[in-house]
Structure formats: C-alpha cells, structure tokens
UniProtKB/Swiss-Prot annotation:
GO cellular component: plasma membrane
Record protein name field: NADH-quinone oxidoreductase subunit N
Catalytic activity: a quinone + NADH + 5 H(+)(in) = a quinol + NAD(+) + 4 H(+)(out)
GO terms, molecular function: NADH dehydrogenase (ubiquinone) activity; NADH:ubiquinone reductase (non-electrogenic) activity; quinone binding
Organism expressing this protein natively: Herminiimonas arsenicoxydans
Topological type in the membrane: Multi-pass membrane protein
Protein family: Belongs to the complex I subunit 2 family.
Top-rank EC class of the record's enzyme: translocase
Amino acid sequence: MNNLNLIPVIPEIFLAAATCAILLIDLFLSDAKRYLTYVLSLATLVVCAVLSLSDFNAGATSYSFGNMFVSDPMSNLLKFCTYIAVGLTLVYSRQYLEDRQMVNGRLGGEFYILSLFTVLGQMVMMSANNFLIIYLGLEIMSLSLYALVAFRRDNAVAIEAAMKYFVLGALASGFLLYGISMLYGATGSLDLTEVARVIATGAVNKPVLIFGLVFVVAGLAFKLGAVPFHMWVPDVYQGAPTAVTLMLGGAPKLAAFAITIRLLVEALPALAIDWQQMLTILSVLSMAIGNITAIMQTNIKRMLAYSTISQVGFILLGLLSGVVAGADGSTTNGYGAAMFYVITYVLTTLGMFGVIMLLSRAGFEADNIDDFKGLNQRSPWFAFVTLLLMFSLAGVPPVVGFYAKLAVLQAVLSTGQIWLAVVAVLFSLIGAFYYLRVVKVMYFDEPADKAKIVASKDVTVTLSINGAALLALGLVPGPLMTACAAAIIKTLAS
C-alpha cells in the first residue's frame, strides 16, 4: 500500500524543522546570548516528547511513505526515552561546555545542533520498516556523532578518538550494508515485513541468507559495542570530551536496540535459531571481557566503557531469550526485559557521567577514580547519588539495576538455559568489585582537594531527580516493566 500519511512522521518533521531554525537563529546570536540555543534545544525536545507520548498512549500502529516508516508503541516509548536522555545530557553538559569555551566563539551552538541531528537519526532508526530507512537513520546519527567526537579540534586525543570512531564506524556500516544487500538479493525486497514473509515461504537461498545474517549481526554488534567488535569503545569514551562521551553512551544504545529488534526479530524470525546462537557467543564474550578488563582500569571513563561492554552482554541475553511470536509469555520476558534493561541502563549512565562533569572544572578533568576520593566529605548528597548510581550498575537492590538484571535472568531461565544464567551471575559478581571500589574511595579515602563542590541549581536538581528515579523505579519497577512488555507485544503483533 503506497500511502503518504504524514501524521506518524510529525515528531520527525517538527524536530528537523526546529533544528534547522535553531541553526539559523544561532548564527545571529552573540556569545552572551548563546544560552538561547540551549533553551530552544531543550524546548524542542519537550515538544517532541509530548508528541511521541501522545502517540504511545494511543497505542496504535500506523505507517507512512509506502510502509517504509512505522509509528508503533515500541518506537514511541523508545523515542520518549531518547528525548529524556538527550535532554539530561544537555543539562549536565552546559556548564562543562561553557568552562571549556565549546559553546561560544567560533564553535557557537554547534554542540546543541549536532545533538538534535543525532536525535533525528535515532528517531528514524526506531521507526524504520525498511532496510534503506534503517541505514539512512544510522548514517544521520553516526555522522553527527563523528563530528561531536572531533569537536575539540585543538585536542589531539579527541581527534585521535574521532579518527578511530570514524574508521571503525564506517567499517560497521559497511558490514551492515553488505549484509542487507545479501538479504535483499535473497528475498527481492527491502521491506522488513515482506522479507519475513518471503523467508517464511522457504523459497529462498538459505546459504545467502545466513551469509547476510552474519554481516548484519556483526554490524549491529559494532554499534552496540559487543565483543569482539568493541575495540573503539574504550578509546573513544576516554578520548572524547566527557559531554560527548555521554552523548555516545546514552541515547544511541536505545536506537541500536530498536534496529536490532527490527532487523532480527521482525525481519528474520525464521532465522531465530541462527542469530540466537550468534548472540549467545557475543553475550558471554562481552560479559567476560568487559567485566574482567574493567577491574584493571584507573581511568573512570575507560572503566565505564568496559562496563558498557559488559552491560551490552546482558542486553543481548534478553534478546536471545525471546521467543518469536511465543504464546507462553517468553516474548514478554525476553524482549521486554531487554528493553527495560537498556532504558534503565541509559538512565544510570546519564547520571554517572553527570557526576563526572560535576567534579570537572575549567582546566581539570575528573577522569580518574582517584578524583572521587573523599567525595562524601566534599558533598554528602552527591556522594549518595553516586552511591545509588554505582549500586544500580552493579545490580544491588533496591536500586533499579537489580530488577533489570533479575528480569533478564528470569527470561533466560524461562528458556531452560541455566548455564547461561549462571555465567551471567558469576560475571555480575565480578563486575560488582569495580563498581563498589568507587563507593569505597568516596566514603573511606581522604580527598586530595577538600573544597566543597559548587553546582548550578539546574544540575543539582536534575542529578537529584535522576538518582531518585533510579531508586523509585527499583522500589516500584512494575509500571515501566509493564509498559516495555506491552510495547513489545503490540509491536510484534502488528
């Protein structure tokens, strides 16, 4: 059906128009009025959030542009979380960017504008129902992120990180595109629904399909940062400005999760046994190498990079534990648990990098674990918030990270893969060491600098709400879990 129904695309159209308008406005702003670009960017995200939330509450699935674009419960919920993630990133980053002259002078408001273009790419990825639309969204997001990583053109470390990210990112895009070309050659269609239908008939070349699947999974693993396609993650996290690291480590994970569902679960359900085996290997390797390597790190950004790799292993556990069109609740347990996990992980990561930027100041980067020494003496409240963040990453109750891990483990056990659940628990216990080491440093070590921490009101309030949200979701995880499960079920049923 060739339809040009623009209603499902209203959030994307608004964001694209607003971003272009902000870009033009920023050209005429003096440095003293650059704050307006920041405010307009946040306002744009708020409007987009209202639009996507209203679509989510409607619960309907609608298509546009000849079924190439879909607005469904999963995409709308993930978009809403993306707006929150990027909005928090902008709030946490504002003072950090101003201290380093990154939002004035010749750079202007480019950080905010590139951030909005990143969001646009993620939105397109989440709503893509066509191979080429997925690739289009991926490139919009990736090109914006490449520019953000290289934002500090006078910083050799940042430029090196940008080069690594660009080269490996281009390689990942090539893998994904080559895999898509194989799938297109085997099925004769770029439409995800049609690809699934053709494969289900059995009238396809199975070796070509498997060959294409391998490249698609490799490309997705690059974007997620799963082992053995994780080489870029530690160097880019450490080398990029902390504000950019947060932009990299937050919302893009939501988009990567979305296209994984689109490509594997929606387009290739007939090959579930094959890609679930691949994800099992990626998951175990990611949890093993991520957790073990993180123990040896003294740079907290690098430690969080390896932590991200291990957390991706848990997300993959949920994805490989879902049963396509299962009537026994396994779909809910697997894909819903993975979605719940990635949302809560992103929320936790935002807060942690927010604390790092809070401790940083002009001419000083709080990149090392030693910079957290005695934080409880300098600011008991921020130390407590960091404690909640670390407990969530480690999976310590009653913070939400515990229930996210528990939901994934329950999904794994429901499929009978007891050995996989045992491996996940063992590596989680190993991972708890380096998270709790930061807590020990904050509460039991003496600070090198005993000056009290002074934070702006917006950062103080936002970081406090972030920490409180993790605790509240841990005490009452039901509503978000139910929303994730319902979104997945409705999306896969449509």
